[in-house]
Amino acid sequence: MLSRPKPGESEVDLLHFQSQFLAAGAAPAVQLVKKGNRGGGDANSDRPPLQDHRDVVMLDNLPDLPPALVPSPPKRARPSPGHCLPEDEDPEERLRRHDQHITAVLTKIIERDTSSVAVNLPVPSGVAFPAVFLRSRDTQGKSATSGKRSIFAQEIAARRIAEAKGPSVGEVVPNVGPPEGAVTCETPTPRNQGCQLPGSSHSFQGPNLVTGKGLRDQEAEQEAQTIHEENIARLQAMAPEEILQEQQRLLAQLDPSLVAFLRSHSHTQEQTGETASEEQRPGGPSANVTKEEPLMSAFASEPRKRDKLEPEAPALALPVTPQKEWLHMDTVELEKLHWTQDLPPVRRQQTQERMQARFSLQGELLAPDVDLPTHLGLHHHGEEAERAGYSLQELFHLTRSQVSQQRALALHVLAQVISRAQAGEFGDRLAGSVLSLLLDAGFLFLLRFSLDDRVDGVIATAIRALRALLVAPGDEELLDSTFSWYHGALTFPLMPSQEDKEDEDEDEECPAGKAKRKSPEEESRPPPDLARHDVIKGLLATSLLPRLRYVLEVTYPGPAVVLDILAVLIRLARHSLESATRVLECPRLIETIVREFLPTSWSPVGAGPTPSLYKVPCATAMKLLRVLASAGRNIAARLLSSFDLRSRLCRIIAEAPQELALPPEEAEMLSTEALRLWAVAASYGQGGYLYRELYPVLMRALQVVPRELSTHPPQPLSMQRIASLLTLLTQLTLAAGSTPAETISDSAEASLSATPSLVTWTQVSGLQPLVEPCLRQTLKLLSRPEMWRAVGPVPVACLLFLGAYYQAWSQQPSSCPEDWLQDMQRLSEELLLPLLSQPTLGSLWDSLRHCSLLCNPLSCVPALEAPPSLVSLGCSGGCPRLSLAGSASPFPFLTALLSLLNTLAQIHKGLCGQLAAILAAPGLQNYFLQCVAPGAAPHLTPFSAWALRHEYHLQYLALALAQKAAALQPLPATHAALYHGMALALLSRLLPGSEYLTHELLLSCVFRLEFLPERTSGGPEAADFSDQLSLGSSRVPRCGQGTLLAQACQDLPSIRNCYLTHCSPARASLLASQALHRGELQRVPTLLLPMPTEPLLPTDWPFLPLIRLYHRASDTPSGLSPTDTMGTAMRVLQWVLVLESWRPQALWAVPPAARLARLMCVFLVDSELFRESPVQHLVAALLAQLCQPQVLPNLNLDCRLPGLTSFPDLYANFLDHFEAVSFGDHLFGALVLLPLQRRFSVTLRLALFGEHVGALRALSLPLTQLPVSLECYTVPPEDNLALLQLYFRTLVTGALRPRWCPVLYAVAVAHVNSFIFSQDPQSSDEVKAARRSMLQKTWLLADEGLRQHLLHYKLPNSTLPEGFELYSQLPPLRQHYLQRLTSTVLQNGVSET
């Protein structure tokens, strides 16, 4: 016998052993047998077995236990010589089919045949879910005693016991109730035939419920037959009455649903038996059960009785007739088919009641009474099923469906609804805002949860809905189209301006402390709370950015989803610097976008839909980087240095758009966005190294511009690309002109400084000859409005480039001034002066008023769909043609033209007069007149703030040009006054980000003598003459108003310094704004402007130094320096007097009551300031202005005043100060008396006569110096009983005397006299008793003079010493009334006072 192979033997040895074994011819250790026929049977017994030579190994010592579940080793198919495999059959499949391993058997599961098994229908139930299984205490006790058995096993055992106990009842119920007396069935088996007992006419079928299932095979049938025979014997022994009685008892004990199920089960079997018996009737006997008829009738009568008690439901008109042969239609349940009947007609709305809004699948708002066909899929089984469409509540419910298609459909419809709502399609047809309703309902977080779905379709639809919610259509188009305007790259952050309620309540807290307290609180606030005030912050708090990065990086969505994600990211970046930083710092987000959507090499992409945006340059991705770079210079530097944008910019800009192997529109937009990104980086002085590399490319692009401008019609995308190219060259020219920053001591300014620019002047000096022809070519189209609007941004960018070019040229120390002066002269004579004389330019000036937001404030109404937590510009419907951002707007071109003229006039003084002739255009004059006229200011919204900023640029540049012209030659008086009024109006309107313009207006325009022509045209003299007319001969002469105005004009430089000290913006913001407007690129921190919550200066800015002086005095108990106090107060009063006299429209926004409150602050600042003679004269002149007949009716002290919490509180403080330090000062007393007029609140008079009675002795202002008429205090009669009693008490006690307080003495006497002689029958009993008592006490007064005044008062007359006239004899009515009262007093007596 050969030995087994050993471990050291090789394959050659094994082959040698095999050859020896075959040569020896020894018997093998195994026996080979033929495999039997697997499909054996009688049918195939006569066929010879197939010649299958497959060997089967039969081991002798086969173990008893089955082998372990280990996968069999892989087998190789080896066809036998006699049986070749078919060519189309897989060998592995054939091997798998013959596999006998246990694993193959276990995995091959064949269901058993259930065709002959009876199907038991589920038990009908009135509840939606099965009853919850509750373990009783008995069950728990039993389970504890009997081994460890599961709850399921115990329940099954209990059911078996219950089934075993109830066979007798089960035999009765299914065997009764046939519809007829005789029922045929199948031929009984011998076992069933033996069940008929002798001597009985009853015959029973076999058991239907007790089948023996669960017992052993040999015992199941025998046990079931035994139970059946016992049941038959028991029934035979009972009388029919006993059977019916037992039946009723069992029915009462059983569940009605179980009985109904058993009946239906029996009825089904009987129907089956009838069918079978009819087929076998010729050869089969019939079984008669005529004696069971009473039993059947008892069962059948009960449902009939029940049917009589219950009213019949109306028959449903089904669209089709159900057939019994249909699946599950053997028993028709009409209530479940109720939904298939026709819908009722739509109810017509008879009232104006609000109804729930319903929308179509395209988001359209459906009318309440619209009748649509059902095949549109707009009807459902909810409330108001006859109405088509889905409500928002139903759509929300559908988003929680388990079916992904339904979730996607609901999100799609909601996205369509949002898009249409933002487009303004719903208008006023809906009550309230759809966006606000959705946000309040939690739609934001519904979208966020949908982004975490596992289905790509749901994710795509959720992203689409998120874009529809966040990205307002039209906003990005507006900002892109105005990128090349004057400072068009600067934008306001799109974030809510409202603060938390706690911050609003703590406005007095210092900003540093507020910031320290706010940041940890904001970090701990949950996302829903954040989203209630700011949607973007709430979204960022939910880890939105990592999820969007995952979708882009892992799921590889389609082009639409990619564009939606990029649009959402752009909206997040526009929110604030913080949001842009979070987008930049999200791990792998920007890396994925740059790698996948901004590659340096790609396959050519043809026109038409793109299957995928991956590895293809995308203009939207480039725009995202541009928006991120606009948020701050640090972000721009990180983008350029960390993501290899240099190679990508070079790759895209180096080729013309036609050569980028992309669709034409995408190539144009991609090239435009690349140029804009470079321009933004150049705005910080970065990216200069690219200019040296791409200089030939830029020169070639500039040379092609005239040919592109000559195409008809001009392509809008090409015009935007050309404008972006010129904007880039403008920034590079400014970078070349900027000088290295000097050593700066201020840390705020040092932080803005950077390394010098890498672009030199010699590299940009050759650009002007290429740009100027482009400007000339576009200006020829000015007379053709359609062509002019098509090339709109190009001439604007050309003008801005020329301004930057000459500004940088004049700053070069190595250049000769004569060269650039001669070039400016040439440009002015050849281009600008002919342009200024063109009539078409005058039409542009005339259209300013029609496109102005200031002249049309109603055109900027907040959008209906503008929730405060989600800010947008609201340009969904597009801008009208005649609007500031419309296609026919003259603002961008005229602003750029004024910018160039200002630059030339600043450098070349000799051109100033010629260029300033543009200011005499009638359209500009009319525009200024309408802007200066008093009127309602536009409501400050995100769009109005953006539009007003551009409008203010034009106004400032026009005023700057006028100021330069006025410094060289006098302006016409009317023009100078108009420019000054425009400067004053603009100063109070400038928004954050224009701090430099505010400072320049204060420095050069507002306090310029040339803008006050009244000083040389008789203005002071006219004021003196007006004083003489108003004073009259009876008034005491004082310092003339004309003298004060002349002195103010002389002190104008000091006044300017005072306001520059107190009204200049913060230094850091001023430096940032200055760097932007001066082109100092190395100091520009960001292109994102501050939040436009309110204008930089308040409307009452002329009083601002005085208000700050008052607050400093309140915070400094020791007092302020007399010199500073006197100087500041005097300069403010002088300037306010100038405005009140010559520019009253400048103070139109400040109510007279607010001006009075500011004048009171002069007396509250210091105890000695009001005694100074200049202050006395100025306050007296301003008080006279407030008391003019045309101003006094507008004095309202009861309304809310800006900057003042409560006027009564201020007046109480004023009375305290007057009582302490006035010493009877007449001017002080006049200010105390002015709020005591009868038409003002009684609270002010009660404060004086109730709490400050001692001040009455110091109010010695003569009647002749009272600034208003005495009738203002006496008419109408006083009706406040408490005040009348105070009047009477002060008169009787002597606290109010004519020599101490002549004015209020006359007032008190007048009101008391009117009260005691009043005979109003509608007066209350309390008033009548007080009147009678006061008259009685007056009659008994010991002071004869006071008694005479109170009883004989007639009319007020300030010319008399007493201030009123007296009756020589009382009128008869008063005399009779007094006599009747005094007779009653003499009879009854009166108590002493």
Swiss-Prot record:
<keyword id="KW-0240">DNA-directed RNA polymerase</keyword>
<dbReference type="GO" id="GO:0006366">
    <property type="term" value="P:transcription by RNA polymerase II"/>
</dbReference>
<keyword id="KW-0597">Phosphoprotein</keyword>
<keyword id="KW-0539">Nucleus</keyword>
<dbReference type="GO" id="GO:0003677">
    <property type="term" value="F:DNA binding"/>
</dbReference>
<keyword id="KW-0804">Transcription</keyword>
<dbReference type="InterPro" id="IPR013929">
    <property type="entry name" value="RNA_pol_II_AP1_C"/>
</dbReference>
<feature type="modified residue" description="Phosphothreonine">
    <location>
        <position position="321"/>
    </location>
</feature>
<keyword id="KW-0548">Nucleotidyltransferase</keyword>
<feature type="region of interest" description="Disordered">
    <location>
        <begin position="61"/>
        <end position="94"/>
    </location>
</feature>
<feature type="compositionally biased region" description="Basic and acidic residues">
    <location>
        <begin position="518"/>
        <end position="531"/>
    </location>
</feature>
<comment type="function">
    <text>Forms an interface between the RNA polymerase II enzyme and chaperone/scaffolding protein, suggesting that it is required to connect RNA polymerase II to regulators of protein complex formation. Required for interaction of the RNA polymerase II complex with acetylated histone H3.</text>
</comment>
<comment type="similarity">
    <text>Belongs to the RPAP1 family.</text>
</comment>
<dbReference type="GO" id="GO:0000428">
    <property type="term" value="C:DNA-directed RNA polymerase complex"/>
</dbReference>
<dbReference type="GO" id="GO:0005634">
    <property type="term" value="C:nucleus"/>
</dbReference>
<comment type="subunit">
    <text>Part of an RNA polymerase II complex that contains POLR2A, POLR2B, POLR2C, POLR2D, POLR2E, POLR2F, POLR2G, POLR2H, POLR2I, POLR2J, POLR2K, POLR2L, RPAP1, FCP1 plus the general transcription factors TFIIB and TFIIF.</text>
</comment>
<feature type="region of interest" description="Disordered">
    <location>
        <begin position="496"/>
        <end position="531"/>
    </location>
</feature>
<dbReference type="GO" id="GO:0016779">
    <property type="term" value="F:nucleotidyltransferase activity"/>
</dbReference>
<feature type="compositionally biased region" description="Acidic residues">
    <location>
        <begin position="500"/>
        <end position="510"/>
    </location>
</feature>
<keyword id="KW-0808">Transferase</keyword>
<feature type="modified residue" description="Phosphoserine">
    <location>
        <position position="72"/>
    </location>
</feature>
<dbReference type="InterPro" id="IPR013930">
    <property type="entry name" value="RNA_pol_II_AP1_N"/>
</dbReference>
<dbReference type="Pfam" id="PF08620">
    <property type="entry name" value="RPAP1_C"/>
</dbReference>
<feature type="region of interest" description="Disordered">
    <location>
        <begin position="266"/>
        <end position="295"/>
    </location>
</feature>
<feature type="modified residue" description="Phosphoserine">
    <location>
        <position position="1121"/>
    </location>
</feature>
<protein>
    <recommendedName>
        <fullName>RNA polymerase II-associated protein 1</fullName>
    </recommendedName>
</protein>
<feature type="region of interest" description="Disordered">
    <location>
        <begin position="34"/>
        <end position="53"/>
    </location>
</feature>
<feature type="compositionally biased region" description="Pro residues">
    <location>
        <begin position="64"/>
        <end position="74"/>
    </location>
</feature>
<dbReference type="Pfam" id="PF08621">
    <property type="entry name" value="RPAP1_N"/>
</dbReference>
<dbReference type="InterPro" id="IPR039913">
    <property type="entry name" value="RPAP1/Rba50"/>
</dbReference>
<keyword id="KW-0238">DNA-binding</keyword>
